[in-house]
């Protein structure tokens, strides 16, 4: 019987053991747990709470366990409650009674909270790195297509011409905000709970600052009740992940649409597409579709954790064991999505000729013709009505703007002159030469800015 059941007269029911164990998933915290225990043992010795000999024996044993886990020789016993007890149990086997001194001035409540704080800090760093890689892929494609124009859409209807790099860099901006959110989330995770004990602190002269420094935390928690029971930092990561995955889902949707035969704006590399079991001709954008689908999974992780936390009184409650599976799954799902998307974007082949052909439809220059009339002295509202009627006429005649004669133009306004034919895709793009616009000069500046952002982040592009 486990020593933590010394209070009880009989062992836990077999079903209870299976129901309450977290080892099948929290084993992933082994690095964080060993790191925390090593720092704790070193501090206990420095403070004279345990002997230097016991401390070194504990640290040596923990190093052995780390090697065993990483080489696959560690035996995870199914009856063990969690990763903390698995490591402690093996430590007893390796060094004997000295192992029992490790848990002095510590509870699993502050122990696991510290482990997860470390995990989330690392997850934030890894997520940001993966976002940067995807940003680099988007920037690379933007630089490769400086003059490629395509229709911009509102309501999935052709609206105005934009440059392809302008479109791609829109996602760069979304991802840049994601980086900012994960950077902020890391700040909340960068606080060490260890030393809070079960809930009220501990009656030992701990040097919490020493442990925090060794573990790389910038601060220690200020309220033991809060420290062992708060999971805000997990919720913040999950919330940020949900937003980031949503951005990927939007990009996924466009890759699905753009790679269809009807659009054919992009061809996805064979390595990032799949076939059909019955239709030989199919080249399916499954990576993009799965990324879009997995967005619900990430949202589910956030909703799970919000629900776990919503009714918990202070301080620690076993409900908090349910924090790890949604966290781990979310970290994995978002990480995989970012990685696979970076490869898919990097290898995608955009089709400028198809985009140009699409610009010939939908009267994409309607707004620019209205602006032309404004330049001639007409009010914008009147110009809007004039061009709306002009579009209706062109549709009825099955003509493009360029195919209309000047006489036809002048049926709608005498302000139209020969220079109306100078209103074209190039002039429409050049006209939007203000910060944030799609003019080539602005795109060049946007690309330079994006390159600077990645360079400052240490990303080579």
Swiss-Prot record:
**Under the GO molecular function aspect, what terms does this record hold?**
argininosuccinate lyase activity
Q: What is its EC number?
A: 4.3.2.1
Q: Which domain of life is it from?
A: Bacteria
The places in or outside the cell where this protein is found are: Cytoplasm
Gene Ontology biological process terms, A to Z: arginine biosynthetic process via ornithine; L-arginine biosynthetic process
- Functional pathway: Amino-acid biosynthesis; L-arginine biosynthesis; L-arginine from L-ornithine and carbamoyl phosphate: step 3/3
Q: Is this entry keyworded Lyase?
A: yes
Q: Which GO terms describe its cellular component?
A: cytosol
Please state which protein family the record places this protein in: Belongs to the lyase 1 family. Argininosuccinate lyase subfamily.
Quote the protein name from its UniProt record. Argininosuccinate lyase
UniProt gene name = argH
